[in-house]
Amino acid sequence: MNVINFIYSIFDKKLFKCGTISSRGLFYNDLNFFHFEIYFLLALITFLIFFVILSNKKNYRSYYYLNVGGIFSNLLPFVVILLLIILNTNTNDSYYLFAGFYYNDAAVVFFKNIILIGFLIFTFAIKQYLSYFKYYDFEFILVLFISLFSSLLILNSNDLISLFFIIELQSLTFYILVASKQTSSFSTESGLKYFILGCFSSGIILFGISLIYGFTGLLSYTDLTLFLSEVYVTNFILDSSFFSFSGFLIGFLLLTVGFLFKLGSAPFHMWMPDVYEGSPLLITAYLSTLPKISLIFVIFKLYYYVFFEVFLFSQGLFTLTALFSILLGSIAAIYQVKLKRMLTYSMITNTGYLLLGLSFGDISGIYITIFYLISYIFIMIGLFFCFLSLRDRSSGLLVKRINLFSNLLEVNPSLSFSIFILLFSIAGIPPLLGFYSKFFLFLFSLKYKMYWMTILFVIFSVVSVFYYIRLVKLMYFNRTTGWIFLYDIPFLNSLIISFITIINCLFFFNPNLLFKLIYNFSFYLYI
């Protein structure tokens, strides 16, 4: 017996649950399943070594030429593009690894593609942010890269414990990013608030997982699915022989509350306004878009697959939090005078629409939620790119108050038009992209006979249009005596803003392309 076979014989063969793994040995073909993760980690380690050895030496002659912002912002797009290429080499593989801890299929690859494409767009905003503020510390970039890795790894989780650990890794990076603006005490305060309340929500999730494990003895998604299908009988009546099922339901509801807290839905939104206002605008843009993709995927996996037999208990909670989020977000945003607080309440409103789609409980819910999620992220990235391009003339800082948008039409008509289109799109004005997402959401609500809820959602959707129109009114009809914005927008940022604006305007010519793509991947999550 050679050395490789001897080492392989030591391992329990249950470690590899998938039958597609080669029997020749641990070191022959098994690493083929981890090309994406290996390349990601190698890139992370390479950047870390380079920054620690060279970039952090301030007495080194070329430190000011080889700054972190310049080097990383130029290399990062190529790294992400290579990640996309490696990710899509084996898109049809479906397999379990490490006793079911790790899972991959076409739906996971689809969501990873969305996150990576979104992050690729963000790399150009990162370049502008670092170069303008002369931010040379490598920790910011490193933590941002780790947060991306954790967001991608969440999608492969197939066990409640591994899911919790990865969510905690992601949360730790978020705490650091929120408090990354060292010159601002407000940023430090926001990071501390986020840390305390984030730990509280993590404790709720962990307590729910412990109750689920205590009353079932299971943590694997696959095992829990089989177990619940056995104790559940027809007509939505629980098997009375499972005497401790009530304790399981408490854990299930605690897990649901923890995820709603992470999503920032009302009434679990208390942390969002202060945290998002205190964090740098780039981090606010990042936290409000890409991490939501991984959380929504986890909710799909848990509530449409693992806990589908008891989905009825969370369906009402999803509907109520959706209504409360839309109500609170629509009304509270009207009274905001600060840009980031207004956007935060807009995010809470859109989270309510996402939860409404999740409450449907079938493939239609998956389809409309994914479509709304992609539309929302696409529009919000465009809006944040516009806002990151605006700086106050007197202070040179990014715009904080909405009254500073006065007279923007005279300063930059093209940017004013882009903001106008994107605001109307997220408000749901036809025939823009955002209109289709809300239209199908309300259409499916009527299909499931949620008549009163649909009426309320439409009313508050109209109310939310007010604060978007108010911003447009400031740009187009308010006049000021001075020029507020006199800073050039980088070419790549202008290109991205123009592209997103054009797609929003031209989407209605051929919407079936995106519809069919999302509908096909919805089956992977539902079947």
Swiss-Prot record:
Q: Which GO terms describe its biological process?
A: ATP synthesis coupled electron transport
Q: What residue intervals traverse the membrane? A: 33-53, 66-86, 106-126, 135-155, 160-180, 195-215, 241-261, 281-303, 317-337, 347-367, 368-388, 415-435, 452-472, 489-509
One molecular function GO term is:
NADH dehydrogenase (ubiquinone) activity
Return the NCBIfam families for the record: NDH_I_N (TIGR01770)
Q: What's the name of the protein?
A: NADH-ubiquinone oxidoreductase chain 2
Q: List the disulfide bonds.
A: none
Reactions the enzyme catalyzes: a ubiquinone + NADH + 5 H(+)(in) = a ubiquinol + NAD(+) + 4 H(+)(out)
The keyword tRNA-binding appears for this protein: no
Q: Which Pfam families does the record associate with it?
A: Proton_antipo_M
Query: Where located?
Result: Mitochondrion inner membrane
Q: Which organism is it from?
A: Acanthamoeba castellanii (Amoeba)
Cite a GO CC annotation. Answer: mitochondrial inner membrane
Q: How is this protein situated with respect to the membrane?
A: Multi-pass membrane protein
Q: Does the keyword NADP apply?
A: no
Q: Which family does it belong to?
A: Belongs to the complex I subunit 2 family.
Q: EC number(s) for this protein?
A: 7.1.1.2
What is the enzyme's class at the highest EC level? translocase
Its biological purpose:
Core subunit of the mitochondrial membrane respiratory chain NADH dehydrogenase (Complex I) that is believed to belong to the minimal assembly required for catalysis. Complex I functions in the transfer of electrons from NADH to the respiratory chain. The immediate electron acceptor for the enzyme is believed to be ubiquinone.
Q: Which InterPro entries match?
A: NADH-Q_OxRdtase_suN/2, ND/Mrp_TM
Keyword terms: Electron transport, Membrane, Mitochondrion, Mitochondrion inner membrane, NAD, Respiratory chain, Translocase, Transmembrane, Transmembrane helix, Transport, Ubiquinone
